[in-house]
Amino acid sequence: MKKQHDTIIVLDFGSQYNQLIARRIREFGVYSELHPHTITAEEIKEINPKGIIFSGGPNSVYGEGALHCDEKIFDLGLPIFGICYGMQLMTQKFGGKVERANHREYGKAVLKVENESKLYANLPEEQVVWMSHGDLVTGLPEGFVVDATSESCPIAGMSNEAKNLYGVQFHPEVRHSEHGNDLIKNFVFGVCGCSEGWNMENFIEVELEKIRETVGDKKVLCALSGGVDSSVVAVLIHKAIGDQLTCIFVDHGLLRKGEAEGVMKTFSEGFHMNVIKVDAKERFMNKLKGVEDPEQKRKIIGNEFIYVFDDEASKLEGMDFLAQGTLYTDIVESGTATAQTIKSHHNVGGLPEDMQFKLIEPLNTLFKDEVRVLGSELGIPDEIVWRQPFPGPGLGIRVLGEITEEKLEIVRESDAILREEIIKAGLDREIWQYFTALPGMRSVGVMGDERTYDYTVGIRAVTSIDGMTADWARIPWDVLEKISVRIVNEVKHVNRIVYDVTSKPPATIEWE
């Protein structure tokens, strides 16, 4: 299929900010992909990008295990922009000098522009930027000039405009760099000559054609959860092939209040899709009886979901394709060799090997925020598009310890009150995620002149851009008070409310 847009590729050298670079570029209306630093020059030629960005990274170019790239990339004649480690790598390649700094520089710095190369066109001579480096460039490669300096960094920016090579020691992709977006824009449009052409309207048009070409007259199966990703996948594929799509919705009894009914109403009645609802509450609860360990709960829920889905899928004939809501973030993160497992991933793991489906993953080039935009373009209701991130194990990991029907009801009802009041206060678009959890501890209280010994409910609310890091949300006290009063008065067996004021890190967003 003919490519509809210009592309900038980002080579990943291990920076925690590498996804931000690609996202910033997409926000400009230009498509951007993240690739491992091991990509070859030949593979890049096949992609046919307009320019390349080398990301930052934690290594030293001279250190053991330093990451390098295919040197033939520099012979492609494409504009290259090196950020932090990327600039140091470029310096090393062209014979400049990189040394260990006297002390690691981390935080804001004032940048002074000394040479107005295309990268700094129409930008102020002084600007605040974000530094995060242990090495620095101390000697320019031949043919390069100093573009910018800072107090601790005599070569904070450099360029060889004859070869369209640029480097900066700071991180323009981070919002703390006040003109960072403009600087990246200057590279994308001013240096690479890109045109805007990446938007959801074009994406839908191209993706619908791709789905029709791939599927032909065959049938597609989709596991529908009611979450944003699976909902957008289902609606997009249904728009492409109509009744050739069948969705299976498994109600495992761990959903939020009104969620199961809402899914059936929206997709079966609203979009007129073929949705098979499976009531598996009893099956899941029997498997979870007496289980307290959070990892064990996750595995049981994940495995049982696969078995239920497998049972239902085997009843259907002629299903050739399986649709999944894999996002670009999932692909990028699954390729990170150094990532540690903090907890099993929320999404259900691999399907049984004997399920011989071909995969369709229409969202695998999109970030989460782009999926929401796509959902709105497809006419999916706001309550689904802006639905709170919800883990695959559902309320099962918001009841700490053993799961019982009574505990589930407490979390379900308290969570419904929290969501209702947050929406009433107009905070639902400001807060990334908010929910209640039941830590399993009881405390003494007094209600109606009588002593009580009931459960404590925890409220968790965080602000974030992508969920990788998060800060606790500063919900107004009067709103918190209203939520607390309502939960204690309306939810049985609760006499105390606590608010979680821990950021991520050190805590994770979910409690289990």
From Swiss-Prot:
GO cellular component: cytosol
EC number(s) reported in the record: 6.3.5.2
The keyword Phosphoprotein is annotated on this UniProt entry: no
Catalytic activity: XMP + L-glutamine + ATP + H2O = GMP + L-glutamate + AMP + diphosphate + 2 H(+)
Pfam families cross-referenced by the UniProt entry: GATase (PF00117), GMP_synt_C (PF00958), NAD_synthase (PF02540)
Limits of the GMPS ATP-PPase domain: 198-387
MF (Gene Ontology): ATP binding; GMP synthase activity
Pathway the protein contributes to: Purine metabolism; GMP biosynthesis; GMP from XMP (L-Gln route): step 1/1
Active site (catalytic residues): 84 (nucleophile), 171, 173
Keywords attached to this entry: ATP-binding, Glutamine amidotransferase, GMP biosynthesis, Ligase, Nucleotide-binding, Purine biosynthesis
Binding site for ATP: 225-231
Domain Glutamine amidotransferase type-1: 7-197
InterPro entries assigned to the protein according to its UniProt record, in alphabetical order: Class_I_gatase-like, GATASE, GMP_synth_C, GMP_synth_GATase, GMP_synthase, GMPS_ATP_PPase_dom, NAD/GMP_synthase, Rossmann-like_a/b/a_fold
Source organism, top-level taxon: Bacteria
Top-rank EC class of the record's enzyme: ligase
Quaternary structure (record): Homodimer.
Role, per record: Catalyzes the synthesis of GMP from XMP.
Protein name (record): GMP synthase [glutamine-hydrolyzing]
Annotated source species: Bacillus cereus (strain ATCC 10987 / NRS 248)
High-level lineage: Bacteria, Bacillati, Bacillota, Bacilli, Bacillales
